[in-house]
A protein has these predicted regions:
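Glycan-recognition and catalytic cores of secretory/periplasmic carbohydrate-active enzymes
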Residues: 1-141
Length: 141
């Protein structure tokens, strides 16, 4: 763990890989573990990464690129990452770093809530001759 989530919170694809959700889910899982075990050293590493390395793959609204490698489409993101970022911010807030609540609130108000569909009337089920479950009730899902 110390080789990947270093004390400076730096990010390097050689250490972390390029799939952003793999990185953010480990970050939020380590925050959960640190909270559960009351491990301040581990929480400090999570905080250092949140404050430093995470910014190479996220923006102010919590949007996060899907792939951090060279050549990915910079317009492709993954909402799972955003959920991990919010979860980590809330844990850091609970840990006493209350300024992270503001980050979580901004992400929820400015990214997660506006991205939710309220009117699904325009969504039609696609042709589905093979009765694939993923193509049934697409809108309501």
């Amino acid at each position: 763990m110390e080789e990947v989530f270093d004390k400076h919170g730096s990010f390097d694809t050689e250490r972390f890989g390029t799939h952003a959700h793999s990185i953010t889910c480990v970050m939020s899982s380590l925050a959960q573990l640190a909270e559960l075990t009351k491990d301040s050293t581990l929480m400090n590493r999570v905080k250092a990464f949140y404050d430093n390395g995470l910014w190479t793959m996220r923006d102010e609204l919590g949007w996060s690129i899907e792939n951090c490698g060279e050549g990915p489409n910079p317009d492709e993101g993954e909402m799972n990452n955003t959920g991990d970022i919010v979860e980590t911010a809330l844990i850091l807030g609970d840990w006493g770093y209350t300024e992270y609540y503001g980050d979580a609130e901004r992400i929820i108000r400015c990214h997660i809530l506006p991205s939710q569909l309220r009117d699904i009337s325009f969504i039609k089920d696609p042709a589905n001759p093979n009765k694939s479950d993923g193509k049934i009730n697409v809108g309501p899902r």
